[in-house]
Amino acid sequence: KSLEQINRSLHFGQFTPRFSMQYLSSHNQLFYASVSKGYKAGGFNVSFLNNDDYLYSPEYNWNYEIGTKLSFLNNRLSADLSLFYIDWRNQQITNTIPTVGNVIRNAGRSRNKGIEASFQARPTKSWMMYMNYGYTDARFVHYQKEEHGILKDYEGNYLPMVPRHTFSLTTGYSFYDICSWIDRLTLN
């Protein structure tokens, strides 16, 4: 259809609350929990094959996280650990359709759960080392779409573009009091 044949407007609004609790111990060890609602507005697809594809709905999610931030040896060692769970409704998924382009469609429901851990060490005032690891299990709970006239069920499949494992290892060195106009220079 040409753009002149479509005369629609969409209006979206959403309340997105966040609730959190924190406990800071006498040894500067932090423990926390949070619950928050996420939202992404719907919209129009520029390219589409049929009338069902020219609009897509808003997506909603509830995010749950618990974690801790710990420090030891006068802050020379620190560790952060968090567990998370995300319950998604109407997740917006980009589909590439040959000869048409990209079309955004809504998945029925998906969930994402995992763990993130990071460690920092400061052997000297100038030298820092960092290690980060993340594990994510992100899957469709309910998602069906029609491909070439056949209804396909993606329940249990992994979400696209979400790595299961992430890892980084970095180090940095800072030079202090180099001159009067540079307080610190850090190389990573």
Across the structure, where does each feature detected by a protein language model lie?
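Extended hydrophobic-aromatic, low-complexity segments
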Residues: G43-F44, L77-D80, N90-Q92, C179-R184
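Signature of Gram-negative outer-membrane beta-barrel scaffolds
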Residues: K1-S26
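Membrane-spanning beta-strands of outer-membrane beta-barrel proteins
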Residues: F12-F15, N61-N63, S110-N112, R164-T166
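Membrane-embedded beta-barrel scaffold of Gram-negative outer-membrane proteins
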Residues: L24, L30-S36, S57-K113, R122, ...
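Acidic glycine-/aspartate-rich tracts in secreted/extracellular proteins
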Residues: G38-K40
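Extracytoplasmic loops and strand-loop junctions of Gram-negative outer membrane beta-barrel proteins
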Residues: S2-Q5, V46-D52, P98-V103, G149-N157
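Outer-membrane beta-barrel proteins
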Residues: L3-H11, Y54-P58, I104-R109, L159
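Gram-negative outer-membrane beta-barrel transporters
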Residues: Y85-D87, R105-N188
